[in-house]
Structure formats: structure tokens, C-alpha cells
Amino acid sequence: PCGSSSGSAVAVSANLCAVAIGTETWGSIMCPSNANGIVGIKPTVGLWSRTGIIPISHTQDTAGPMARTLKDACILLGAITGIDSSDSKTILSKGNSYNDYVQFLNKNGLKGKKIGYLKSEEGKNFKVDMLVSDAISFMRKMGAEIIDLESIVTGTPHTDSRIVMSYEFKDGINKYLDDLGKMRPAKDLNEL
């Protein structure tokens, strides 16, 4: 449940594989990972190549690791990071990426960190609310500062993302179909 990478998340959660690769424009790695109790990482656009991924939004599309443990997700994150001449966004990661992200795992890593939290998202499920409350208490205990984003966020942040997706979708699909050449099932989105 919860997004286009749900199959990948279920496969990891059911121990059918150690790790999987999901794709995300707007929640399709993070939401299924959350729903299936696994780790999902949405890398910055350009850290991983998007070659071969059917596009929805060139400014938001990315692939990312899904795993049962954070360490496994970090290993996969580093294994696939790199420059791809077929994806110009990957040039942005030159000098800003690593082959080993496990080195950044630190049991004291929350100390001094600021973590935003939208309290208005509470109230839909008592058990989930209790788990979130416990997690916030744990993060505070580990030295994190929890910031109530209600006083910062205004409007509807999801709306902007959806507008961008709607704007970029047609051109992205048309370019993807064009790049398929003779193998394309349709010449453009309208024909599709």
C-alpha cells in the first residue's frame, strides 16, 4: 500500500530480498517503506541516475534504496551513486557523493540536531500517535531539538509539489516515449 514502490517495500518486508530499489516523485519510496516497517531513503535528485525510469517530474523524480536496516540502505545508497552521461542531473553530485554512507551512521547522531514535526498530522490513529510520541521522546532524550513546524509552515505545502508534477509530466512522458524509438508503444502522451 501507499505508492508505486509498494511491491519493492513488501518484498523487503517479507524477506523476499535483502534490499530493493524504489522510485519516488512524491512519496513513493517513503510512504510504502513506512507502511511496511522498513527503511527507505529518497536521495537528492541527481545522486542516483534516473535513466530508464518513466518520468513524472524531472525536478522531483529519483530512485532510492529500500531495506530492512538503515545500514543495508546506506550500503545500497553508496553502491549505486555515480555520474551517468545519460542523466545530466547526476553531474550535480560530482564531489558531493560517497561510495560509503555507512561511515555517517552515528549512535550519537541526534545530539544537537533540529527535527521538524507537524503536530496537526496527529489524531488519525491513536496507536500511531503514541508511537510518534514515543519516538519524539526518544529523539529528545538522545539530544535532538524538536521544532513545532505549525508556527513556520503556512498554506498547503503539498499543493506546490502537485503543480510542478502536473506541469512537467506531459513533456517528460513525451521525451521518454521519443527516446524509446521504434520500441515505443505510442508516439506521445495523447496517443498513449
What do these predicted ranges mean?
Residues 13, 78-85, 140-144, 166, ...:
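Sec-exported extracytoplasmic/periplasmic mature domains
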Residues 128-145:
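Short helix-loop-beta junction
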Residues 42-130:
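A short helix-breaking turn/cap at a secondary-structure junction
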Residues 104-118, 167-192:
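Short helix-loop capping/hinge segments that flank enzyme active sites or metal/cofactor-binding pockets
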Residues 18-22, 30, 39-40, 67, ...:
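Structural recognition of the beta-strand scaffold that forms the well-ordered cores
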Residues 1-34, 66-70, 77:
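Active-site-proximal alpha-helical scaffold in enzymes
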Residues 141-160:
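Short connector loops at secondary-structure junctions
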Residues 25-51:
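Glycine/threonine-rich beta-strand-loop-alpha-helix active-site module
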